[in-house]
Amino acid sequence: MRLLWVTENYPPSPGGMANSCDRIVHGLQQAGVAVDVVHLTRRDLAPRGAGVRTVPLGDDPEHALRQFWTTLAPGADRYTHVVAFGGTYPLLSAPVYAAWAGLPLITLLRGNDFDTGMFSLRRQPVVLEALRASAAVCVVAASTAPLVAALAPSTPVTWVANGIDTTEWQVLPSERQKAAAWRAEHVAPGRRTLGMIGQLKNKKGVRLLLEAVVAGGHASRFHIVLAGELEPGLDEWLAGHPSLAYTALPFQDRYQLLGVYAACDLVALPSFYDGLPNVALEAAALGIPILASDAGGLADLVDDTIGFRFPAGDPHACRAAVHRAALADDDQLAALGAAGAARVRERFGVASETDGYLTVLAATR
C-alpha cells in the first residue's frame, strides 16, 4: 500500500492540524504503509527529506498544482490511494489527481473544512465535490458523520477519532516546578487557574465562557490563562471587565505548552462547533479536568465523568457548568482528572487511530 498524501498542514507549519497530520502519517508508516506527503504551502520552506515534497503555491496556485501533476503523472501508477487532508487546496486538487491516476480518493475531513466550508461561497463547491468524489470520507467527530452523509449519500463515512501518544506526552518535574513558581507570582491565593489554549478564534467560544464566569459571580474564584492567538476585540472586552484576573500568553509550540498545562487546574473548550481539538486530548491525558461544550468530537470525549459539559452555544448551561466547576473541591477535580487520563489511554490512543485508518484504506483498495 502506498499513499499520495496531499495536505496544507504539515510540520514545520504550526498548529494542531499540522500536528495531527504528522501523527497520522507517522502511525501509518509505523504500520508498514508507504506515505509520500505532498505539502502545499505558501510559506518559504527548506527542502525536506525523503517522503515529503513541498509544493510552493506562491501567487499562482493554479499553475503550481497543474505543474505538480506533470511531475507526478509518470509515476502515479505506484500509488494505491490518494489522500486529501485538510485545507481548501488539497480538497480541490486531490480529487483531480485521483481521477486522472485512476485511484480511490480518501478524504480526511477536519472540522474547519466542513463546519465553515459549507457556508462559504468560495469553499462550499470545493468541499462538496471532494466529498462526492471520494471513495471514503473520515471524520473526527461522530456527530459529523450523518451531516456528511446527508450531502454525499453515496460516499461511505467513517468516524476515526484523533489520538494521542500518552507515553511521550508527560509533564517533567522541572516544568511542574516552573508552573508552581509562575502561579506563586501571578495567581492570587485561593483562585483556580482556568486555561484556554490554542487558536482562540470566534468558534472557540472564548467570550461565551468569560461572560459566564463574570455573570455567574465567579470572577473572584478563577484566574484565566489565555495561551494562544486571541480573537479580535477580546483585549477590549477584558479591559472592560477588570474584576476578571487573567494572563495572556503568546502562541507556543505544542511541547512548550506542557508548562502551561501544568499551571492549569482546569482547561476550557467552550466551542460553538469543532472537530476533536488536540488540546482536549492533551489536557485529559495529563489528568486535567475539562470544562467543555458538546460541540463535535468534544461530545465523544467529555462527559460528567471527566469534566463539566454543557450544550454548545447555550449561555445559561455554560454558566451552570462554570458554577459546578467553581464549587468542585480538590478531591473532585483530582477524580475527574484521573478518569479523563484513563479514558484517553483506553479509547483515544494512537494505535486505535491508526487501526481506524488502516481499516478504511483496506476497504477501498
Question: Where are the model-predicted features located?
Answer:
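Short His-centered aromatic/hydrophobic patch
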Residues: 84-90
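Donor nucleotide-sugar binding/catalytic pocket of nucleotide-sugar-dependent glycosyltransferases
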Residues: 107, 127-178, 188
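Nucleotide-activated donor-binding/catalytic signature segment of Leloir-type glycosyltransferases, i.e.
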Residues: 235-252
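Short alpha-helical donor nucleotide-sugar binding micro-motif in glycosyltransferases
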Residues: 259-264
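Short hydrophobic beta-strand element within catalytic cores of glycosyltransferases
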Residues: 289-292
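Conserved acidic donor-binding segment of nucleotide-sugar-dependent glycosyltransferases
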Residues: 304, 308-316, 325-330
